[in-house]
């Protein structure tokens, strides 16, 4: 990351939840919309997602944000058993190594906790990134999300493998 001095990776704080939810919705609308229908986007990034339930999903997880100019520009979280749940980077900040840095941090946490592999359910949009990070596809899935069906990919990666 050439401009890493302006980017700060730090643990998620409860006060970050609203910014992360806003970033998630924006990213789904601006980035994932390339691979999803309008109905799928509206269901996935629904305005009915409640902030407190969103915030609670970060509890007891490895969770990080990347900050630039006091704004959240990326975030991720992983369960204590190694399931990478969410990984989103602002559309305006993609291609700067932020997602790679977040995943590398989770891989480090997993290795420290003796978690042998990380799994994720990657969107169509995110699948190429995860492949570049050394993940492999276990299976294609069709999952229901607030009345819409989305395609994603169960992927996994051993924690000790180097990314390409």
Q: Where do the protein language model's features map onto the residues?
A:
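Terminal substrate-recognition subdomain of acyl/acetyltransferases
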Residues: 2-3, 148-164
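Short secondary-structure capping/turn micro-motifs that flank functional sites
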Residues: 126-127, 146
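Extreme N-terminal starter segment of soluble prokaryotic enzymes
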Residues: 5-8
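Conserved active-site tyrosine of GNAT-family acetyltransferases
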Residues: 130, 135
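Conserved catalytic-core motifs of GNAT/GCN5-like acyltransferases
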Residues: 119-121, 136-154
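Acetyl-CoA-dependent GNAT
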Residues: 11-15, 22-92, 103-105, 109, ...
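Conserved G/P- and acidic residue-centered "switch" motifs that form tight phosphate/ATP-binding loops
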Residues: 97
